[in-house]
Structures are given as structure tokens and as C-alpha cells.
């Protein structure tokens, strides 16, 4: 009955709601073996868009799926019990995957090894699946991945081809596709609705341009965007109306520590020609794109405190990612979160009923 109610509610949302832009739900699972020191450590983090909302750590005193965002705390005890069971089942499956990988690669059990999975879904403004993901890595290298068609696999090497043949025989891609098109999107809609005050907000960026002389002949113009949410933003420099993409230095979007983000884009320009350059900013929170120039009479002062705070959070984030997913090869696609699809998991779970696959 609860499953039926969820499906009905999801169908109603799909018909009546429109979402500002696309949204994503992603899970990352990481298992790290430690010979002589017990079972592998298993860590899970889940994200909706840029917000972490759940975490599981097998090394905790009492391992449970734990909330990491206020809006997920409204889920009842059954939710947390179910997700905890799924995590424990996934941890066991990934331990087996580590043992299988040792055999496939003819490796010794003496060393430490890592098995990781990333899976999830992107949802379009119409509330339907935009793209699904299912990617696996072993010891920091691509192992096998679900293709964009959600019906076939790409194996990275001959060992992964063994897994590919096994999964093709079991028609695992069909099960994965059903989860991504159904359960994954259904739960993403539910989370977006429950956390709409934070997840569906649009904080516009605070913008300015700074000027940094390099020599008597050149200077750097840096276009700043601070305090925006969601993280997706576009910064471009133009010279006399022509894009300067190839000559632009663009940093990755960085967290500021207050659930907003910052980013900058810089170009080196000939001294005296600064006014020929314009910075163009596009963001969901802006009613229309912004166009900025450097104003010589009022050199912008960089808000050092905010930037330092952002860099501090970036360091912490990188440290966490190093434990959870740093060794997973980055793909050009935006990707979802990973984990193994547990055969024993309840179909009411946000993780789905087929998330943990043995290699």
C-alpha cells in the first residue's frame, strides 16, 4: 500500500509540477580493504543536487544511515531502518566484489584495495528521467559503467569483461534502467518537495571584476561570482563581443561554507584595453544575464573573509572526497552517486531493489 501511494503521488507530481531546471540524486559508495585490521570500511554519501543528505559509515559505533540535511529528518523510523539494512547489504556485496577483483587481477590479499560505485539520476524540468548513471571503479581506475542508453555496459579491461558477460547474461541493465526511470526519479521528486525551501531556492550571485597588473604591458581581469545557489553557473569573457573561451582561466565551482558557492573566471589583457572586455554571468537566480566591466575608478575589493572560508570548506570537501570518491575517475558527464544495488533491498528504498551487483 505505501508503495502504491508513493507511485500515485509521484505520478501526480509529474503531471502538475514543473521544476526550475534539472535536478539530480546521486549516491557514492566506497569500500576500502585493510588486511589484518578487520572487514573493509564501507562509506556511503548521498546527494540531491549539491546538498549532501545522508551518510553511512560501517566504522561507526552503531552503523546506521544518518541524516545530513534538515529536510530528510522528517522521514520516519521505517525509512531509516530500511536504508540501514540496504547499506549493510551493500557493504557485504562490496566486500565480495573486493574478493572477486583480487581473483580477476591475480592480486595478493596482503595489500589494501578500493571498490567504488556511483549511481543516480538526473531529472528534467518535466519531472522525468533526463539521464541515468551506474559506474564502478577498482583501485582508482574505471572498471565497468552503464552506458547512456541504459541497456549496455562498457568494460575497461579484460577483467571487467568477465563482469560484463555475467551482467549481460543476468539482464542486469534492464533492472538498472527500471530503477533509474522509476524509483530513483520518484524519490528525487519527493526529496525536492520535502526540501523545497533549500533545494529549490535560487540565490543570485554577487558579482564584481578585479584588476591585477602583471607588468607594464599586461593585466589580469578576474570576474567574481559569490554566494550563489545552485552551483550551476556560467561565466564567460568577451572581447569586443567575441567569446574568449580559449584564453579564459576558469576555476571549479567552490563551496563557501554556508551552502552557497563561488567561482571566478580570468583573462590576461593588454594594458589600456580593459574596457574592450566584458564578463557575462548566467545563473538561475538572475532575472537576466549580467554584463560586467572593470571600473577603474572603483577597484573592487575582494571579500577576503568569504573567499578564505570558501577555500577552507573546499579543503575539507576534498578531504572527504578523497576518502569517499576521490579515486573514482571523473567523467565529462555530471554523473550520479554510487553504490551497489542490493538484491535483498526493499523496493520502497531510495536505493532501489537491485543496487548491489557482484562482479
Curated annotation (Swiss-Prot):
It comes from Pan troglodytes. Pfam families: C1-set (PF07654), MHC_I (PF00129), MHC_I_C (PF06623). GO terms for molecular function: peptide antigen binding; signaling receptor binding. Residues 21-305 are extracellular. Its main location: membrane. SMART domains: IGc1 (SM00407). Residues 203-294 are annotated as: Alpha-3. Heterodimer of an alpha chain and a beta chain (beta-2-microglobulin). Involved in the presentation of foreign antigens to the immune system. Residues 340-359 have a biased composition (Low complexity). Residues 330-359 are cytoplasmic. CDD domains: IgC1_MHC_Ia_HLA-B. Residues 332-359 are annotated as: Disordered. The chain crosses the membrane at residues 306-329. One of its GO terms (cellular component) is recycling endosome membrane. This is Patr class I histocompatibility antigen, B-1 alpha chain. Residues 21-110 are annotated as: Alpha-1. The modification Phosphoserine is found at residues 353, 356.
Amino acid at each position: 500500500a505505501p508503495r502504491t501511494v508513493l507511485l500515485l503521488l509521484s505520478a501526480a507530481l509529474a503531471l502538475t509540477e514543473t521544476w526550475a531546471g534539472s535536478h539530480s540524486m546521486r549516491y557514492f559508495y566506497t569500500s576500502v580493504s585493510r588486511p589484518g585490521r578487520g572487514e573493509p570500511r564501507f562509506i556511503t554519501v548521498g546527494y540531491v543536487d549539491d546538498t549532501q543528505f545522508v551518510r553511512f559509515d560501517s566504522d561507526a559505533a552503531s552503523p546506521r544511515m544518518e541524516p545530513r540535511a534538515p529536510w530528510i529528518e522528517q522521514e520516519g523510523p521505517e525509512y531509516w531502518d530500511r536504508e540501514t539494512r540496504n547499506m549493510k547489504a551493500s557493504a557485504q556485496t562490496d566486500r565480495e566484489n573486493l574478493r572477486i577483483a583480487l581473483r580477476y587481477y591475480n592480486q595478493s590479499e596482503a595489500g589494501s584495495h578500493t571498490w567504488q560505485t556511483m549511481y543516480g539520476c538526473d531529472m528534467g524540468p518535466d519531472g522525468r528521467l533526463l539521464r541515468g548513471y551506474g559506474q564502478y571503479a577498482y583501485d582508482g581506475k574505471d572498471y565497468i559503467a552503464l552506458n547512456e542508453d541504459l541497456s549496455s555496459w562498457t568494460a575497461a579491461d579484460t577483467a571487467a569483461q568477465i563482469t560484463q558477460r555475467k551482467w549481460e547474461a543476468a539482464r542486469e541493465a534492464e533492472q538498472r534502467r527500471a530503477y533509474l526511470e522509476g524509483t530513483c526519479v520518484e524519490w528525487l521528486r519527493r526529496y525536492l518537495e520535502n526540501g523545497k525551501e533549500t533545494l529549490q531556492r535560487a540565490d543570485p550571485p554577487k558579482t564584481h571584476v578585479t584588476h591585477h597588473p602583471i607588468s607594464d604591458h599586461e593585466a589580469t581581469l578576474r570576474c567574481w561570482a559569490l554566494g550563489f545557489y545552485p552551483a550551476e553557473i556560467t561565466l564567460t569573457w568577451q572581447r569586443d563581443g567575441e567569446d574568449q573561451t580559449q584564453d579564459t582561466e576558469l576555476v571549479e565551482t567552490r563551496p563557501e561554507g554556508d551552502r552557497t558557492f563561488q567561482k571566478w573566471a580570468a583573462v590576461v589583457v593588454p594594458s589600456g584595453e580593459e574596457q574592450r572586455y566584458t564578463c557575462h554571468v548566467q545563473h538561475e537566480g538572475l532575472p537576466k544575464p549580467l554584463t560586467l566591466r572593470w571600473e577603474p575608478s572603483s577597484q573592487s575589493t575582494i571579500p577576503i573573509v568569504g573567499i578564505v572560508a570558501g577555500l577552507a570548506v573546499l579543503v575539507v570537501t576534498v578531504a572527504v572526497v578523497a576518502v569517499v570518491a576521490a579515486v573514482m575517475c571523473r567523467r565529462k558527464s555530471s554523473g550520479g552517486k554510487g553504490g551497489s544495488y542490493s538484491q535483498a533491498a526493499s523496493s520502497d528504498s531510495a536505493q532501489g531493489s537491485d543496487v548491489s551487483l557482484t562482479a
